[in-house]
């Protein structure tokens, strides 16, 4: 089987991480893959990386919303672009698939749009230099799993309709 297809079929979301950091050179490869995601009209969403101490208060929860992952990458996209959600989602997919190909585990954490629409989130965006028009698409947590690798769930019948 083709190695790329194999990676796509075997990647799983991991919801428990060790404290071990992803080496900088590996993280840079993952981020570069995100930069090369397809996007409408060649407009690439912004990436803000290496947020290891994101405050749970901003996420609106008292527990760790990032499952103990040592690295959080936030994907933002320009809300002025009609394809901002699609563009950012492709970046998220590239990040997670590249991570898997490099032996790093990942998970997409939702609520980025809500987080960065809050006053605390807007303050973080301003601090990081993210333009006001950019909205949060997702948090991509990265690290090394602390438990067993998740098994694939059964796929539903009728996913593909051929006409």
Task: Tell me the role of every PLM-derived stretch.
Residues 4-14, 18, 130-163:
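C-terminal helix-cap and adjacent tail motif
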Residues 34, 73, 80-124:
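Small-aliphatic-rich amphipathic alpha-helix that forms the alpha element of a beta-alpha
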Residues 1-71, 160-163:
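N-terminal amphipathic, basic helical "cap/leader" segment at the start of enzyme domains
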Residues 71, 102, 134-138:
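Generic beta-strand structural signal
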Residues 40-42, 64-67, 128-134, 152-153:
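Solvent-exposed alpha-helices and their adjacent loops that cap or buttress functional pockets
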Residues 12, 76-79:
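Short, histidine-centered active-site or binding-site loop motifs used for metal coordination
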Residues 38-39, 80, 147-149:
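Short, acidic Gly/Pro/Ser/Thr-rich loop/turn segments
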């Amino acid at each position: 089987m083709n190695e790329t297809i194999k990676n796509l079929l075997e990647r799983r979301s991991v919801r428990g991480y060790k404290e071990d950091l992803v080496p900088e050179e590996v993280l840079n490869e993952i981020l570069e893959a995100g930069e090369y995601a397809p996007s409408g009209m060649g407009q690439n969403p912004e990436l803000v990386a290496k947020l290891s101490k994101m405050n749970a208060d901003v996420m609106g929860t008292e527990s760790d919303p990032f499952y103990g992952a040592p690295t959080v990458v936030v994907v933002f996209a320009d809300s002025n672009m009609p394809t901002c959600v699609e563009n950012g989602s492709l970046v998220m997919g590239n990040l997670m698939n590249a991570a898997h190909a490099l032996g790093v585990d990942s998970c997409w954490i939702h609520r980025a749009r809500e987080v960065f629409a809050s006053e605390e989130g807007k303050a973080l965006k301003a601090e990081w230099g993210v333009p006001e028009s950019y909205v949060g698409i997702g948090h991509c947590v990265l690290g090394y799993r602390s438990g067993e690798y998740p098994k694939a769930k059964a796929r539903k019948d009728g996913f593909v309709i051929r006409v």
